Amino acid sequence: MSNKVIEVKNLNTYFDDHNVLKNINTDIEKNSVTALIGPSGCGKSTFLRTLNRMNDLIPIFRKEGQILLDGKDIYDNNVDVVELRKKVGMVFQKANPFPKSIYDNVAYGLRIHGEKDEDKIEKIVKKSLKAAALWDEVEDKLDKSALGLSGGQQQRLCIARTIAVSPEIILMDEPCSALDPISTIKVEDLINQLKKDYTIVIVTHNMQQATRVSKYTSFFLNGEIIETGNTDDIFLNPKNKQTENYITGRFG
């Protein structure tokens, strides 16, 4: 992988004494989509949350090893975690719009990070909603509550809110699991558009989704990466028997 933006070296994570991730070594390529697959409880969401230090919010969490973003360890003591999470945004499994207007949902992060120029905020809100393929559906109701949007629209709003603060990387934790098939297609189309400008790491239980949106896939099992590589190779010609068993439905 020639153009890596994230390097993970000898990563072990623990909740109390429970070793959740075991000796993870992997890279994430810039401006690509990497899918994380594996059965429930295999560690893929825990891994995703190490990439912007969301696990730090859990008191019993600790880690060993390094995660380098653009060559710098994100767990160094001098790292500003707020700035890190601006650079590495997160879209959660369940859409979580704020109980505010559609406009204020997207503007919120900009204001939190100190932007006071309302003309600039307005331009970024519009640009972000367009990038999230939502503008045409909401342009005449920006002052309405975001809670009135459909589930699929709310998830795209959360994506717009994430990209408004200009992240380098977008993490997605099963972003389509609560959506109907039509909304899922819209989010997948959006992912394929966003990868031109962002690096995306997506956790999914939907293996067909992994084949549709990702360039690379990592298969997790019992806290380890069993196999990682080009998505076509993983699904069409897996090197590991455990990978083959999982993607053919023999377990998981």
Swiss-Prot record:
This protein's record includes keyword Cytoplasm = no
Q: What is its EC number?
A: 7.3.2.1
Its keywords, alphabetically, are: ATP-binding, Cell membrane, Membrane, Nucleotide-binding, Phosphate transport, Translocase, Transport
Which PROSITE patterns would you find in this protein's record?
Answer: ABC_TRANSPORTER_1 (PS00211), ABC_TRANSPORTER_2 (PS50893), PSTB (PS51238)
GO molecular function terms attached to this record: ATP binding; ATP hydrolysis activity; ATPase-coupled phosphate ion transmembrane transporter activity
Any matching Pfam family? ABC_tran
Q: Where is the ABC transporter domain?
A: 6-247
What does the subunit section of this Swiss-Prot or TrEMBL entry state? Answer: The complex is composed of two ATP-binding proteins (PstB), two transmembrane proteins (PstC and PstA) and a solute-binding protein (PstS).
**What protein name applies here?**
Phosphate import ATP-binding protein PstB
